[in-house]
């Protein structure tokens, strides 16, 4: 007797392949059926065993034994099917566990891949910062070498210049272009009244004492005294002469410059606008004093970073000075320098080169190649070339500056020293200029390759040009004029009426 259990649901008919879950469910049903069938067969086997024990030797004994053997075989088949079903269920559970583990490992692999991508990005960022740090270190080393070179050049500065405090490095400053116009126009003997006379208008004698006191207090940093003094004088002038008077405009200009030194740029701007309006009404729109006020206002806007507003003011001041003084006047060249620097801060390098070239031609035509303003303007133009990555043009200008300073002074140059002093200085310069040329060449190449025209490099380049321009100056003249020049330079630097020290602090 053979017992077979058919799988429910038409298993094995080849209609469709069941899913693993369906196979497990059907296998569990088959297991339940086999267990019930096993219990039934065990009951039959028990009854047959009892019947065989109760009957003796008889004719039906063989039939009972045959039945018992069939039931035993059926039980063995049922046990085998149950064992295989249990194995199948265990295998299914194991496969499920493996699938879950597989999904877990896949999720972990995705997470590790994401972490790997993050680590790669972080590594790339770290490498980028490392390269930037290495470049910064290299740039700082080049700047250090350049500053050490500039420090070596200071030994050639005259005593009066070396005693003046160094201003901190700053961005391109409009004040670095040239000193006060009145100081250069009338010389040291008249600098005490530098801001007193503006564009042909002379301050009355009663205001000069007050003006000098304001200069003195402002130079000492005693603004709490200088400001009330200016305001009191301004009120007295308005009561006696009215608001629209040139004296009032002059006092407004002085008060504006005091506010400027206190970094009160808004108040200074308002006062300069008022002074400009008064001067235009009383002196005319094309008076040199109007040009000076326009220039002061433009420089003040430049200190506040408002270069676009400062440019038309500076342009108008240039037009006035060209019309009144002529196109080849030194003040026109100074105004061109200011306008070029404003354009440079706006990235208008074509206009910068044009303005500097024109200023350079004016200085060379008036003072020749040995004019200190030629070196300053060439240095400014070289700085503009550096900002445009025009390294070759910048290097040529720097070499021209050094070559001019290395040449002996022309025959017409003033010389108040003795012959022995002159010969000694000439020998000293000739023995050191070969080293200076080599040092400045290395410094310029490093400057070209790394500094790329930063503000500090521009200021340092200006100081270098100024230092080198003093190499041909007779040292015997320094002690005589040391104190007056320093005192008057401080006064004019504090309260200039045109362009002095209006750069960012």
UniProtKB/Swiss-Prot annotation:
Comp. bias (Basic and acidic residues): 435-453
Sections of the chain in a coiled coil: 88-150
Chain positions with Phosphoserine modification: 173, 467
Region Disordered, annotated ranges: 1-20, 157-193, 409-505
In-chain residues carrying the UniProt-annotated modification Phosphothreonine: 499
Entry-linked PROSITE patterns: TPR, TPR_REGION
Pfam families the record matches: TPR_10 (PF13374), TPR_12 (PF13424)
GO MF, any single term: kinesin binding
GO annotations of cellular component type: cytoplasm; kinesin complex; microtubule; mitochondrion
TPR repeats: 207-240, 249-282, 291-324, 333-366, 375-408
Entry keywords, A to Z: Coiled coil, Cytoplasm, Cytoskeleton, Differentiation, Microtubule, Mitochondrion, Motor protein, Phosphoprotein, Repeat, Spermatogenesis, TPR repeat
Ranges of compositional bias, category Polar residues: 489-505
Keyword Cytoplasm attached: yes
Quaternary state and interactors: Oligomer composed of two heavy chains and two light chains. Associates with microtubulin in an ATP-dependent manner. Interacts with KIF5C. Interacts with ODF1. Interacts with LRGUK. Interacts with VDAC2.
Function of the molecule: Kinesin is a microtubule-associated force-producing protein that may play a role in organelle transport. Plays a role during spermiogenesis in the development of the sperm tail midpiece and in the normal function of spermatozoa. May play a role in the formation of the mitochondrial sheath formation in the developing spermatid midpiece.
Family: Belongs to the kinesin light chain family.
Protein name: Kinesin light chain 3
Species of provenance: Bos taurus (Bovine)
Species classification: Eukaryota, Metazoa, Chordata, Craniata, Vertebrata
